[in-house]
């Protein structure tokens, strides 16, 4: 009824056929792309999530129900890599640090996984170790990309 009301009242359309709404077959885990800024929590641990409105503060997201579960595995492996290598994480306020964003795609039909890291500079220290960890933990991994963004912005 809300849709009908919006179309007639807001849209000004009076004469149309209104059919029943068909619900989504898969209300969760239907997205095939995700991107997360990477930062540090107050305790120093790596945090992946979303920016709080109009801030550089990252709200942690351990499991977004819109995204494939495989993305959680990528995040966990990346956290282990950061802990193991003490990887330098980018700080939005100072513009210093290396590892900025994690971007992922999953092929719905092929189940192939693409992982992209956005870094401040050229490459990533010990990136061979990161690739090894990803390959060991993700049998459907198809590609790993290191993308350089040196601009002082949180735009990927």
Residue ranges with predicted function:
Residues 1-156:
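Accessory RNA-recognition modules of RNA-modification enzymes
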